[in-house]
């Protein structure tokens, strides 16, 4: 924290209270890490490979809510599903191991790592997810307003006269 360089804190093997202690210590050393959001917290399960039911991606939402800092995901699961879900949940940082090949490799990291081709495909998919998520603002989109059908899509059924509860409607109504 003394250097002022951004810190990415992986939270593997940590409870929420331990993360809180770490955040408090960093803030004590240099308050700008919090005020300028130079500290990011990564949800991480330190297990190789991480079983799907231990990934706990929603913990990113807990970290975001609790600390108001950028969050991300340090992935040790097999494949890329967890990364894609993390991005959809709002991860700003993704950490995933990569390797030139998994063939003939015995070290644990290679089994959870992506190859060069997989990295590029995953980056493309992550960008698509971010695009599909949008910015969260509910507005009439350009594709809706530019379309000729926007009026016909807003049609509805209306009654011409007052009716009583339980009255059966007819075509004339």
Regions found by a protein language model. Give the residues of each.
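Catalytic cores and adjacent flexible loops of soluble metabolic enzymes
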Residues: 1-173
């Amino acid at each position: 924290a003394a250097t002022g360089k951004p810190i990415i804190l992986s939270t593997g093997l940590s409870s929420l209270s331990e993360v809180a202690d770490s955040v408090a210590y960093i803030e004590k050393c240099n308050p700008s890490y919090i005020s300028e959001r130079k500290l990011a917290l990564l949800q991480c399960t330190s297990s190789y490979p991480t079983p799907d039911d231990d990934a706990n991606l929603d913990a990113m939402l807990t970290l975001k809510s609790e600390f108001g800092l950028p969050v991300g995901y340090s992935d040790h699961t097999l494949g890329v599903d967890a990364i894609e879900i993390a991005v959809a949940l709002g991860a700003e940082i993704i950490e995933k191991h990569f390797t030139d090949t998994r063939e003939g490799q015995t070290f644990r990291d290679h089994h959870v790592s992506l190859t060069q081709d997989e990295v590029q495909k995953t980056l493309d998919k992550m960008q698509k997810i971010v695009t599909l998520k949008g910015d969260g603002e509910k507005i009439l989109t350009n594709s809706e307003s530019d379309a000729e059908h926007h009026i016909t899509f807003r049609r509805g059924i209306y009654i011409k006269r007052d009716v009583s509860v339980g009255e059966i409607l007819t075509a004339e109504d």
